[in-house]
């Protein structure tokens, strides 16, 4: 079943290829959506697709790429959003 989740990731997550790595991982899991930097230093990630794959992606986001240091991740299910690819904003 296709669903959408939004996640906010805190820690050392900007300037460490977090968004680009998230895009690569999302593509591996056949997910669409986006990853974008927020003014407060966090990263926001929208994930759209199969719920099982989103759960796997959320586990990956809890650690992120090697250079990142995730201190907190918050996520919630949101109304379905149609995205055809995963973009970086």
Swiss-Prot record:
Q: Which domain of life is it from?
A: Bacteria
Amino-acid biosynthesis keyword on record: no
Q: Which residues does the Swiss-Prot or TrEMBL record annotate as the active site?
A: 19, 37
What the entry lists under InterPro entries is as follows: Acylphosphatase, Acylphosphatase-like_dom, Acylphosphatase-like_dom_sf, Acylphosphatase_CS
Q: Where are the transmembrane segments?
A: none
Keyword Hydrolase included in the entry's annotation? yes
Supply the alphabetized keyword list.
Hydrolase
Name the protein family: Belongs to the acylphosphatase family.
Q: Which NCBIfam families match?
A: PRK14426.1, PRK14451.1
Question: What is the protein's name according to its record?
Answer: Acylphosphatase
The organism of origin for this protein: Colwellia psychrerythraea (strain 34H / ATCC BAA-681)
